[in-house]
A protein has these predicted regions:
Chain B
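Membrane-proximal extracellular/periplasmic loop immediately following the first transmembrane helix
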Residues: 49-101, 114
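Hydrophobic secondary-structure segments that place a key small or acidic residue at a functional site
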Residues: 97-100, 111-119, 130-197
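N-terminal Sec/SRP start-transfer signal
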Residues: 1-34, 44, 53, 388-391
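Hydrophobic alpha-helical transmembrane segments of multi-pass inner-membrane transport and secretion
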Residues: 16-41, 245-282, 303-316, 361-368
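Short helix-loop junctions at transmembrane helix boundaries
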Residues: 311-358, 371
Length: 232, 391
């Protein structure tokens, strides 16, 4: 399944200014991800996993080296180009869901489709399909404050998946969920990965997530410490 | 843009009370500004109409020495009516009036007045001059209600007037008040007493002479006549324009304060929004917006307050403004003491231009005020915004 390379990271370094000095979060990372992978960047806080995820998500740029996502070099993308990449090809799932609080479930999931200028009928069909994947078709009118944490994260997954992106980037998606909800969410993501061939890239240090990953990249102090591929 | 409007609308409606508080404050500004501007337009319109109806008609010829602000010129401000105007006078299209300086003695008191000779059959002015066409033991006279109050004179009262004729001789006679009129133009009422023109000419030995010749219809241009100067209505109402202009400047300060309060609320909301909604901003960027587009969204959101305010204003303001236009606004002060033509009740006049320009100005100012704090988004780091870590 994981044959075509869709993310290619070469000698990637990312530094942040800290007062008069610099803090290097990523130190010459080399990684490649293929289509349909279910992989995770694993490591403690400060290991650089979120930084790497943000660069892959074109929310940040490398200080040096290169990150190519779906053939686009992140460092040389314009703001418009990066926005287009995120809009068309990438889906995001965040630790704290980041749902639009004043919009209901339907509107939250519909949002990426609005940006892609689908017609109202197309949007409705696609939103209902995405909500069906996550089992929330009965909550279309509910607003995020009326939902449980697990339901919010399922809405976030539906929002990330509704446009059928090539890559979904999930940053600590289960950090705010209990064990039962975490497993439920992860099973949904595994199912979508298998059915839609979407590449999932996680940033996590949660054991529950790690157990579901088919590929685990352990980061330590900005370096790749281990790159494990499960055989099952 | 369509999407920004759609999202901004959802966000505003979703924000609930915060949105509606801003909208109500802003709508209050809309209604008050339109109402006050309407009052000024109505006042201007009413003052000019009243002046035309009571004082200036469609324009005037003034005897060249006449200066309404200098009573000492009155003794020299008369001349024979030009022959070329006789036909118009006969047809009633021009009304001559003679003004002389005099003194009135009500209840033994002495007061200066301008004695105005007016044809009792004139129909250009709204003055009830027909009340001068009566046979009485004394000369019939009409006065305004303010003069009546000040001089303590009522219909049927006799009073002595004194004047100086062309030979410099003082003379006096009695007049009887045959009519009291109510008029919004102070210069027609205060300090003036109207008697029949021919009687005044007789008293002054000024047969066939006049001080002012007033036209019925608006005259775009009149030929030059030696010894007379032509004044069109624009010149004659210039003082109204100047006073309205002065009042408008004063009111503009009030509008500015009103707008400032409303804008302060919008600005505050925008600043708070940008601080509180960092994660949302980050999410918009993660989902495919550029930072510029998010700035646009927040600007549209802020500006949309003014659109909602215009709608809310229409809901409660329209009935109020229509009611005011019908029932008018009664002045809290004695209008006759204001110094210019002013009715006790002013009727606001709202033109489409007035409403549209007010709406456009408020929308424009709101947009600028909304954009100002939103520019901060353009400098935000989306990864930090996503975590709500910006200070």
């Amino acid at each position: 399944m994981e044959n075509t390379s869709i993310i290619k990271i070469e000698h990637l370094t990312k530094s942040f200014p800290m007062g008069k000095s610099k803090f290097t979060a990523l130190k010459g990372i080399n990684l490649t991800f293929g289509e349909g992978e279910f992989a995770g960047l694993v490591g403690p806080s400060g290991s650089g996993k979120t930084t790497l995820l943000n660069i892959v998500g074109s929310l940040d740029v490398p200080s040096s080296g290169e990150a190519k996502v779906l053939g686009e070099s992140i460092g040389s993308l314009t703001a418009k180009g990066a926005a287009r990449l995120r809009k068309e090809k990438l889906g995001f799932i965040f630790q704290s869901y980041n749902l639009l609080a004043v919009h209901n479930v339907f509107e939250n999931v519909e949002f990426p489709l609005l940006l892609l200028k689908y017609t109202a009928a197309e949007r409705k069909k696609m939103v209902m399909e995405a909500l069906d994947w996550v089992g929330l078709t009965d909550k279309v009118k509910s607003k995020p404050p009326q939902l449980s944490g697990g339901e919010c994260q399922r809405v976030a997954i539906a929002r990330a998946m509704v446009k059928k992106p090539s890559i979904v980037l999930a940053d600590e998606p289960t950090a705010n969920l209990d064990a039962a909800n975490s497993h439920n969410i992860l099973q949904t993501m595994v199912k979508l990965n298998e059915e839609l061939k979407t590449t999932f890239l996680f940033a996590t240090h949660d054991e529950k997530v790690i157990n579901y990953l088919r590929r685990k990249i352990f980061l330590k102090d900005g370096n790749v410490d281990q790159d494990e591929i499960s055989t099952n | 843009m369509k999407l920004a409007i759609k999202l901004a609308y959802r966000n505003l409606i979703g924000a609930g009370l915060r949105t509606w508080l801003n909208v109500i404050v802003l709508s209050f500004s809309f209604v008050v500004i339109i109402w006050m501007k309407g009052i000024m337009v109505g006042w201007d319109h009413q003052a000019k109409t009243d002046m035309k109806n009571w004082e200036i008609g469609g324009g005037q010829y003034w005897q060249e020495n006449y200066d309404p602000f200098d009573p000492f010129t009155l003794s020299e401000s008369h001349a024979a009516i030009p022959v070329s105007l006789n036909d118009e006078i006969t047809n009633g299209e021009i009304v001559p009036s003679l003004i002389v300086s005099g003194t009135i003695y009500p209840q033994g008191r002495m007061q200066s007045v301008a004695i105005v000779g007016m044809n009792p059959h004139q129909s250009i002015f709204m003055l009830p001059t027909e009340k001068l066409d009566t046979t009485t033991s004394a000369i019939p006279a009409i006065i305004g209600s303010v003069s009546s109050r000040n001089l303590k004179l009522n219909v049927g009262d006799y009073v002595t007037i004194r004047w100086r004729n062309v030979n410099g001789m003082f003379d006096a006679t009695e007049v009887v008040i045959t009519g009291i009129f109510s008029c919004n133009v102070p210069s027609v009422d205060v300090g003036k007493i109207y008697i029949p023109l021919e009687k005044l000419r007789e008293m002054m030995s000024l047969k066939g002479e006049a001080t002012i010749l007033t036209f019925r219809e608006e005259q775009s241009e009149r030929p030059e006549i030696t010894g007379w100067s032509y004044k069109n209505t624009a010149t004659l109402t210039q003082s109204v324009d100047e006073l309205i202009q002065t009042k408008t400047v004063g009111q503009s300060i009030f509008y500015a304060i009103l707008l400032l309060l409303a804008m302060l609320a919008i600005f505050d909301t925008q600043v708070l929004s940008i601080f509180r909604r960092q994660k949302e901003i980050g999410t918009y960027i993660a989902l495919g917006y550029t930072r510029r587009e998010v700035v646009g969204l927040f600007t549209v959101e802020g500006a949309m307050h003014s659109i909602l305010a215009a709608i809310v204003s229409a809901i409660y303001g329209l009935p109020f403004l229509i009611w005011m236009a019908k029932s008018g606004w009664t002045m809290p002060i004695e209008a006759s003491e204001f110094g210019m033509a002013m009715a006790q009740t002013l009727y606001p006049v709202y033109s489409a231009g007035l409403v549209i320009s007010t709406v456009l100005i408020i929308v424009l100012v709101t947009t600028v005020v909304s954009y100002w704090p939103s520019r901060k988004i353009a400098k935000m780091n989306p990864t930090e915004a996503l975590r709500g870590k910006l200070q």
